[in-house]
Amino acid sequence: MGSADSKLNFRKAVIQLTTKTQPVEATDNAFWDQFWADTATSVQDVFALVPAAEIRAVREESPSNLATLCYKAVEKLVQGAEGGCHSEKEKQVVLNCSRLLTRVLPYIFEDPDWRGFFWSTVPGAGRGGQGEEEDENARPLAESLLLAIADLLFCPDFTVQNHRRNDVDSAEDVHSLDSCEYIWEAGVGFAHSPQPNYIHDMNRMELLKLLLTCFSEAMYLPPSPESGSTNPWVQFFCSTENRHALPLFTSLLNTVCAYDPVGYGIPYNHLLFSDYREPLVEEAAQVLIVTLDHDSATSTSPTVDGTTTGTAMDDADPPGPENLFVNYLSRIHREEDFQFILKGIARLLSNPLLQTYLPNSTKKIQFHQELLVLFWKLCDFNKKFLFFVLKSSDVLDILVPILYFLNDARADQSRVGLMHIGVFILLLLSGERNFGVRLNKPYSVRVPMDIPVFTGTHADLLIVVFHKIITSGHQRLQPLFDCLLTIVVNVSPYLKSLSMVTANKLLHLLEAFSTTWFLFSASQNHHLVFFLLEVFNNIIQYQFDGNSNLVYAIIRKRAVFHQLANLPTDPPSIHKALQRRRRTPEPLSRTGSQEGTSMEGSRPAAPAEPGTLKTSLVATPGIDKLTEKSQVSEDGTLRSLEPESQQSSAENSPSDGESSQTWREQRRLSNASASGQWSPTSDWILSWKSKLPLQTIMRLLQVLVPQVEKICIDKGLTDESEILRFLQHGTLVGLLPVPHPILIRKYQANSGTAMWFRTYMWGVIYLRNVDPPIWYDTDVKLFEIQRV
């Protein structure tokens, strides 16, 4: 009964607030206490009992009352942090205020007139004490709120265990507390593993929800190419003003990386016991990636209003980014810490892949997108971590889940963002030689995927999945084709033995991309052919010995190369090719690609359910903006190429002058030529046809085709295995052109990808927070909410 009464009283207070036309004095504690003092409302109750329309009504009609509600709620949190929340009543007040602010803040952010409200100073309202500390009291409300949340996240007996049992109830005790002794979980920089405590986890989660809501002001600003628009909430929270920055960063990272959803591995245990840890881990992962939203391409220090200022620190060489969370992340260096992080992320990413004999017997986590963003941030901000990942085969424990997600999401339009981040991570990894070398490890783990069965290496898995994405993904994935093929180009010089299945897939892609209707239907389509020819050239020149399957496939499909060499350039042929083009082509025909049987236990990639919510994404830069070319020297080191030599040495990627927007738009096969905006000319075809890198392949065909034909005639052979045996023992030493230098296209950070990551990350957070629906139905500007 008590609970029902408290909900009723709370609802009455809300109605009073919305109906009062006169401002309620901040000193009227009897009125304001109704919102937090005597209620035991859950966060779900608060969302149900405080409707969006009523918050907006108060904001428009009695703004001073909404302002006072926020002041008073923050004041209560500050008092709780100062006093240490010793009584149950104090703890309840803190939780109630936290829930109320989580509900109200998005409606403050959505109104531009209110946006500066939390950054204004409130005399006397910033701190609980009535002392002479005018400077303290003049803190902006946002700063008081953020510091209170930080203090409360390390509050003994509320969010952490009390190490001292002598009950010193003094405020000094709270301020002298060394929160580094209270890190939530063992791992990086902390060896002690505290006893799990359900209540503490729940309280942490509520406070992290509020913190995430504070940070979410970014959702209410439209995407802008200037990534200088720093989030003032994140900037202050991750500054030296927050004395808990280091222990909180460590707590969040360790909580995520130490989590094991399977636990003791007892089947169905997740059905018997609720896992209270997972919601905390999700919240920790989301807060962590938002605090790390720092553009590594810029180094200016923005102020609260977004303008950049020079400081005395700028002249000196700064120790690292001003964002302490980014700084701490970039300075992790111990091997055991890297091992802990990598194992933790790999374990969680692999969790949805766990297949047992008992369906649904293991708990499946849902926050793999947040984990991929976290992994990206780790590799981007800490190059030592990236090299550690690539130093051993452990990188394959990240690769396989990413390929699983890419394959699974390829038909689902609501998961385009997941496809992009998976491909971006692989592009980043492929810029390092070690990644290509690691791919030669045999692939023996059989993750059920909707792809043809093959026996081979992780390189085979990568190429077979990429082929599946290109030939049977939905149309919105076409801008990714360049990235997918760039990854294959980057690793190709190191691939020792591709399987026959994979060799056929690569040749099928070349066959599809080199049809005249495809080549002539958009101004950039020929780049895909250049990429594939570069793959073949790299393998022939640098890994010929082990790749008899690919050489055999090239010989069998030699007509494709001859057609390319003799591509028609006269206007009637161009017209005829475009006429032949089907009216609404699929992304690519799958005819000619032997699909074979799919893996046992796999299910086809399914499109999104109609009505599924998704968030829009800003466009990604073209491959020319995403990467820079480097040449591999003889000693294996990389040398960055000057733009001019890039231009001449490889015509197979768009020139810097070409806008990436046109690059994306023109790739739309369905309407490229129909739109009439662009049509191919003889001069245009001649401009790139002469640069097709066919010399190596033509020389190979010139030498090997007569030999293979002779063997077949002499021995009456029709058996592939005999021909393959001949090719395995053959050599082209001295017969091929001089090997070309290996070109690697390394990912480079830029403001375009920084903005893409920001919109993607907040879109994921928006859609994942449905209980309670913190931002649902508010006027977000960073992205659009769409239904599939």
From Swiss-Prot:
Entry superkingdom: Eukaryota
Compositionally biased region (Low complexity): 297-313
An annotated GO BP: secretory granule maturation
Recorded topology in the membrane: Lipid-anchor
Lipid-carrying residues in chain (N-myristoyl glycine): 2
GO cellular component: cytoplasm; cytoplasmic microtubule; cytoplasmic side of Golgi membrane; cytosol; Golgi medial cisterna; Golgi trans cisterna
Positions bearing Phosphoserine: 653, 670
Cellular localization per UniProt: Cytoplasm; Golgi apparatus membrane
Keyword Membrane: yes
Principal subcellular localization: cytoplasm
Composition bias type Polar residues, residue spans: 590-600, 643-680
InterPro entries for this protein: Hid-1/Ecm30
Sorted UniProt keywords: Cytoplasm, Golgi apparatus, Lipoprotein, Membrane, Myristate, Phosphoprotein
Pfam families per record: Hid1
Annotated family: Belongs to the hid-1 family.
Protein name: Protein HID1
Species: Mus musculus (Mouse)
Upper lineage: Eukaryota, Metazoa, Chordata, Craniata, Vertebrata
Gene symbol of the encoding locus: Hid1
